[in-house]
Amino acid sequence: MAVITKIEVQKRSKERFNIYIDKGQGEEYGFSVDQVILIKHGLQKGLEIDEIELGNILYNEEVQKAYLQAISYLSYQMRTKQEIEDFLRKKEVGQAIISEVVSKLLHDRYINDKEYAVLYTRTQSNVNRKGPTVIKRELLNKGVQDLIITHSLQEYPKEKQIENALFLIEKKKKSYQKHSFLQMKLKLDEMLVRKGYSREVIQICLEELKDEKDDEKQQEALHYHGNKYYEKYKKHDGWTFENKMKQALYRKGFSIDEIEIFLQMKREEE
């Protein structure tokens, strides 16, 4: 049995208290608690506490400490239930305490995976223009249930997906001006897959791109690569030269007809 002999406010935090006790051998420092625990257990000078009660006090103090760590972690941005659990595990908090903290956070509505998934979907689609496949994968990695994700993705209709994909195409295609039209389409296709768009949305967007095919830019790209390969292979003669040129330009996405026209032009220049 111990008797509380003194309670003092900590210098660095007005919400934490040092508790001094006497176990029969004079006053000594016992433990420190948060204000919430002080009030919850009715700690005051002269109160007698046994070992069982002391254990309860210290356990609840650990729960409160972990709870405040979680609140601080949440102050930067919303988190999922799993993210909070992972964070506390890294802080070496025991599973029993983690479960209590998470239950309290859920009760106090500091964490709500449904709300998180909806807001995350809106942000990633509107700001970062990610496709639904990537958004779903990221939410799964954050521990959000599949059913909740399916519901949140209803916030991202196909029309919006197409709008975003076309924006990404318009932004990216400028960097592919020296590529053939076919090669540019392949690279844009790969980019949209990485961004998380479905095959259906990608095909719709690339069909619109087909209508914008710029013959002048296609010729510029053909001449750019053709002249580069011409310098590389001109040391070869006849069939070997033409075969290497055709293979190289075909791999770049140019049609056989386009390649033949270019080679004919080079013959006429010689």
Curated annotation (Swiss-Prot):
The similarity annotation says:
Belongs to the RecX family.
- This one is known as Regulatory protein RecX
Supply the gene name: recX
Recorded GO CC terms: cytoplasm
Described function: Modulates RecA activity.
Its taxonomic path starts at: Bacteria, Bacillati, Bacillota, Bacilli, Bacillales
Q: Origin organism of this chain?
A: Bacillus cereus (strain ATCC 14579 / DSM 31 / CCUG 7414 / JCM 2152 / NBRC 15305 / NCIMB 9373 / NCTC 2599 / NRRL B-3711)
Kindly indicate whether the keyword Cytoplasm belongs to this entry: yes
Any Pfam family matching the protein: RecX_HTH2
Q: Which GO terms describe its biological process?
A: regulation of DNA repair
> Where does the protein end up?
Cytoplasm
